[in-house]
């Protein structure tokens, strides 16, 4: 019952926030960003209240400050797309182009400056990708979040990493902040929730820029 309540109440609130924040699409971006942070804190509250699940964050002292960097994060559930917005300051997501085409949800992703890449096209068709990243980093002073696995995976899956994160690291010469998350044990992809140990967000020491 608690799992069903979680799903019903959490996603009902997500829909409500998306509707209430529609005016933010024509307002300053900070308003939309606040809505994302609100859902991040809401996800933590719901996990604790309905599933007695704590979020344990280790390594916050390793978070980079006062320099350009991007975040390479493992991807197991929808949880990290909400909660990482409460840890990092106004992050910008690098994501597959299809997500921007989702009504309402895609509008918000565009508003916060998300950068899309068409994974179905060869590299030469994505030449503007690194230019967009470079402009975003220099104009917004916001960290970028990329999921190198390319999609959500189960905790025991070990898919090969995509080349995007490595190319950003090499081409733009900026530091990388690795983040490991095990949220899939509690909030797995394409499944109903089930009770399990607390999700742990491990923020690891950075990889220095390649300079």
Model-derived regions, located:
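A transmembrane-helix-recognition feature enriched in membrane-embedded lipid enzymes
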Residues: 1-56, 107-108
């Amino acid at each position: 019952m608690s799992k069903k309540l979680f799903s019903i109440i959490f996603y009902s609130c997500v829909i409500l926030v998306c509707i209430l924040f529609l005016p933010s699409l024509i307002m300053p971006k900070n308003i939309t960003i606040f809505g994302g942070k609100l859902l991040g804190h809401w996800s933590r509250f719901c996990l604790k209240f309905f599933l007695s699940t704590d979020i344990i964050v280790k390594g916050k002292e390793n978070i980079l400050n006062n320099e350009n960097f991007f975040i390479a994060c493992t991807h197991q559930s929808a949880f990290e797309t909400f909660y990482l917005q409460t840890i990092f300051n106004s992050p910008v997501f690098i994501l597959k182009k299809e997500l921007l085409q989702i009504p309402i949800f895609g509008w918000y992703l565009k508003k916060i400056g998300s950068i899309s890449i068409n994974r179905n096209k060869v590299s030469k068709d994505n030449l503007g990708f690194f230019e967009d990243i470079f402009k975003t980093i220099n104009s917004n002073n916001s960290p970028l979040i990329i999921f190198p696995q390319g999609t959500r995976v189960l905790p025991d899956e070990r898919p090969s990493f995509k080349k995007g994160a490595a190319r950003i690291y090499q081409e733009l010469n900026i530091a990388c902040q690795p983040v490991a998350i095990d949220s899939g044990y509690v909030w797995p992809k394409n499944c109903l929730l089930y009770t399990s140990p607390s999700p742990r967000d491990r923020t690891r020491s950075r990889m220095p820029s390649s300079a």
